[in-house]
Amino acid sequence: MPRLALASVILFLGFAGGYWFQRPAGGGDVAALTEEVSELKEMMMLSLLEKESATDRLRAVSLTSELGKASDKVTTALFSTLNNDPNVNVRLAALEALIPFTSDSKVREGLVRSIAFQDSPLVQVNLAELMAAMQEKKSVSELKKLAESDRTPKEVKEKIKKSIEVLI
C-alpha cells in the first residue's frame, strides 16, 4: 500500500511539474499557430479570388473579415476585385471588406481612385456614400466627374450630388 501511495504522489508531481514547465512555452506556440492560420487564410483568400465562380470570389472577400489585419497583398487584391470583377455583388463585397481599413491613407487613396473605374450604379452610390461618411474631400473631383457623365443614371447623379454637398 505505501508503494501505491508513493507512486501516486510521484505521478501527481510529474503531471504538475510538466504542466508548470510547459505553460510559458505554450503561449508562444499558440501565437505562432495563430499567425500560421492567418497566413493560410490569406493564401486561401488570394487563391479563391482567382476562381471563375462568383461564389468562390465572394467567399474569398468574406475571408478578409477573419483576418486580424490586412497585408498590402490583401488590400491590393481587394482593390483589384473592386475595380475589375465582372460581378457587381463581388465588387460590393470587396468595397465592404475595405471599410475596416479606411484609417489607412493608402486604402483611402485607393478608394478615391476606384471611383473612376465604376460603371455599376450600386457601386457608384455606395462609394459616394462612403466618401461622405469618411469626409474624404479628395474624392470631390472624381465624384463631380461621375455626376457630370452622360453614362451615369439620373437617380445616381442626384445621390452623388448629395454626397458632394456633404463633403463641401
Predicted features along the sequence, with ranges:
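Conserved hydrophobic register position within alpha-solenoid helical repeats
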Residues: 59-63, 94, 126-127, 157-160
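Single-pass transmembrane signal-anchor helices and their membrane-water interface zones
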Residues: 1-27
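Amphipathic alpha-helical scaffolding segments comprising HEAT/armadillo-like alpha-solenoid repeats
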Residues: 34-48, 69-82, 102-116, 136-148
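Eukaryotic acidic, Ser/Thr-rich intrinsically disordered low-complexity regions
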Residues: 148-168
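Alpha-solenoid repeat junctions
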Residues: 64-68, 98, 102, 131, ...
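Immediate post-signal-peptide N-terminus of mature secreted/exported proteins
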Residues: 26-51, 57-65
